[in-house]
């Protein structure tokens, strides 16, 4: 239930997020497993998995949904080897080289033959809708994966006017200044990990871990026209994370003090524990994210 990554999007026009209506809409795009000839399937599953029946899970107007993608694993090398063997066999039989059109048709036949026997992998992606804050959070490792899920949500709802929540001031400019002068806004502190890149197209990239970021070595890189593109940060000793230049938030780690607030709920009661953890996550994000964006100089004004 605790997000490991966070791609933050801002709702830039008024949207009525009605949980009951969304429940019905999600059901229309419910996930179904791959059939024998399907390369992939993408749809919605219960937000609490086997511990809940509803597609959505709601806490104080915040809505959690979950998308599932199943993909058949057909390595290109396997297809290529099978195709080469078949082409050699047919060219030997017919005594002539096969045309491109014939090879393409063979390739399609090979894929059709391999699909039913292919292994599949599945991935869950959670989306947290925060109407009061006007934010949507996607627990994904990249904006590309987040956009895929939001495209499905947009198709499901009919409309979803969102944009990545990117501050007006370039994130790398702010991160570089924080490392340079060591003066972070209240509640934020540097950890010991950063990535610095040269402003030159073919310049060097420096990655450091367990490194005192106020050291002369790090400052010399900044003076040599490198900017901080990733930075490990601590927020109020409650959340640790890595912030990147594209404003993606990764490797979220929550303090024991925070997570232990629900220790009175038995682990055996998974549904109750998930619900309580979700409430904690929502409460924390509703304070952390506005604090972070204010520290980064604020977001542009939304469209009228």
From Swiss-Prot:
It holds the Pfam family RdgC. One of its GO terms (biological process) is DNA recombination. The keyword Mitochondrion does not apply. One of its GO terms (cellular component) is bacterial nucleoid. Keywords: Cytoplasm, DNA recombination. The keyword Cytoplasm applies. It comes from the Bacteria. It is found in: Cytoplasm, Nucleoid. GO terms for molecular function: double-stranded DNA binding. May be involved in recombination. Belongs to the RdgC family. This is Recombination-associated protein RdgC.
